[in-house]
Amino acid sequence: MLRFVDLIQNPRRFLALTGYTVDEFRALLSFFIVRFQAYVAIFTLAGKPRRNRTYSTYKNSSLPTMEDKLLFILHYLKTSPLQESHAQVFGMPQSQASQWIHLLLPLVKASLADCGELPARKREDSTLAEDEAGLFFHDGTERPINRPQDPEEQHLYYSGKQKEFTVKNNVVIDEPCKIRFLSETVEGKKNDKRLADESGYRVPQGSV
């Protein structure tokens, strides 16, 4: 069973399973706690309006600490496992894992926005062009998805190159390895340059 208190003893494994160093994790945690506490003050974990009883964590909870909750959702985002597999790693039934995923995903996204680490998704939101000229890395990231049920979507998302159904995003990363722009999600077979042209983002003049 994966737990923060155990994983923190191995910083390299911690980075591999979350995409964050321990220091980066702790920095994000402070914003995550604020978002989580604000949510459970109003709603139950099932998303229903909270009445009289305040939120408390049970001793036998599968995610007993705020660190474990953040670890749970970051590990899910980093490794993209099946919910059944993710549930097994954290010692809970799949239905409970699904509930936690749907609860924590928007909270961690909001936390990243709060600390200024959420990449721009639209050209008009990007501040790339305002930066000083520098080194930027541009790449397309293609990943598999489950076979769509709709025949038209099957045709759209099937990649002959990969021999599977895929989606793609373009990312722009600066020299310190911070993701500065993340394009919309499209079919994996779309050409990287075409997606870049459609996204319309611009790096500072004189950049490499």
Where are these regions (language model features)?
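Structural motif
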Residues: 59-67, 159
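Short secondary-structure transition/capping motifs
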Residues: 17, 61-62, 75, 90-93
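Short, amphipathic alpha-helical "recognition" segments used to contact nucleic acids or chromatin
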Residues: 65-79
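Charged, often Cys/His-bearing segments associated with DNA-binding zinc-finger transcription factors
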Residues: 1-61
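Short, well-ordered secondary-structure "scaffold" segments embedded in the functional core
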Residues: 80-208
